[in-house]
Amino acid sequence: AGYIVLCDRYKFTAFARDTVRGCSPDWVRRLYSFAALPDLTFFFKAPLDVSLGRILGGRPRLKYHEAGMDLGLSSDIEESFKLFQGRLLKVYSVMKSEFGLIQINANQPIEKQQEQVRQRLAGSIDLGQYELDKLS
């Protein structure tokens, strides 16, 4: 309590991935129950082709597990990625209502996404109560 923590991914990523891979949603939630629920969680949603393009724009190929190749959805890694991500999106859709995830359209310009995040933060957290530590 009394701290602001920003992180990329959290227990919700494990909830989605483990559930899609066949684990019981209740079991996964109990497994990660030690991790506190955040006050705010943003879910950045982009079309699958946009997500794929962003990944491949930064490296030459998809990773085996991020494409869901372990599930045997398709022998084509890009097709498997799309099928796997589609399943993840369904789980995130359920978690949106269950945990109050705030969906941001990740197909917008980054400045617009940042503006929306800042507006939600400003409406939920009084940043003025936190003092930044000075680095020596």
Language-model regions: role of each:
Residues 2-4:
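Loop/turn-to-beta-strand initiation segments
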Residues 6, 40-42, 102-104:
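Hydrophobic/aromatic beta-strand patches that form the interior of the parallel beta-sheet core
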Residues 9:
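Walker B catalytic acidic pair
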Residues 12-13, 110:
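Conserved beta-strand edge residues that scaffold enzyme active sites
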Residues 14-88:
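A glycine- and Lys/Arg-enriched "phosphate-lid" helix/loop adjacent to the NTP-binding pocket
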Residues 56-136:
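NTP-dependent small-molecule kinase module
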